[in-house]
Amino acid sequence: MYRAENIRVTAGAKVILDDASLSLSAGKVIAIVGPNGAGKSTLLKVLAGERRYGHGTVTLDGTPLQHWDAAALARKRAVLPQSVVVAFPFFAGEIVALGLPQYFPRSEALRLVERALREVDMLSAREQSYETLSGGERQRIQLARVLVQLWANGGQGYLLLDEPTASLDLPHQIATLRIAREHANAGGGVLAVLHDINLALMAADELVAMRAGRVIAKGAPKEIVTGDLIHALYGVRAEIGAVPSGPFLLPQSIRG
């Protein structure tokens, strides 16, 4: 289990996270939602071990995160950031292969890279220059990279995804969340920062709702999502509809 408890992060006088807590267990998809500047990405980076914090604790499988060495941590969790800068010319397939451990058997490496490219619908771009890909295509290649990272180490572990659908068209948004669900169903855990509240409602077992650095609500979507919560998060009025699979958001008309 991944656990963050009472995390506080500051930058000078600004409080970025204020007593933020969440737990992520195997078999679950958790979505962090909230407005810009709420601290969503910072909390994910704290869990990833990529952001220092001034107060609180982060543990992975009961061990403080700072006690994990980099190689062991890479076998347990893979991180998809909002954007990745690639400074050298690579083919798309080579970017995916960067997720593999050093000295990984070549035949198995080729198999996993091909599998991951198929999973994200990018096999045809394997020999294409990464620089020539669109933003959404690059995002899918990076998703394939983190999938390979976990598959090479047993296939489970935790996916930490920071806005994985932001650059994608609707079919690939849905496909990305299907991949996340399948990873959880196979025994992994997924934490995703999502801006599209309806995608979050569709995909997540649990929502973590954040505003101004604080977690103001968390739980199953059916249990916590109300018009009042949406107003508290975003300052807008919305109706909450329901279908058998769960709630969905209907913003008020913008036509006046």
Region annotations inferred by a language model:
Residues 2, 16-19:
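Conserved structural motif at the start of ABC-family nucleotide-binding domains
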Residues 33-35:
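The feature captures the beta-strand-to-loop junction immediately N-terminal to the Walker
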Residues 48:
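Helix-to-loop junction immediately C-terminal to a conserved catalytic motif
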Residues 56-64:
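Conserved ABC transporter NBD signature motif
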Residues 110-125, 147:
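Conserved ABC ATPase "signature" region
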Residues 159-163:
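Catalytic Walker B motif of ABC-type/P-loop ATPase nucleotide-binding domains
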Residues 231-256:
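ABC ATPase nucleotide-binding domains
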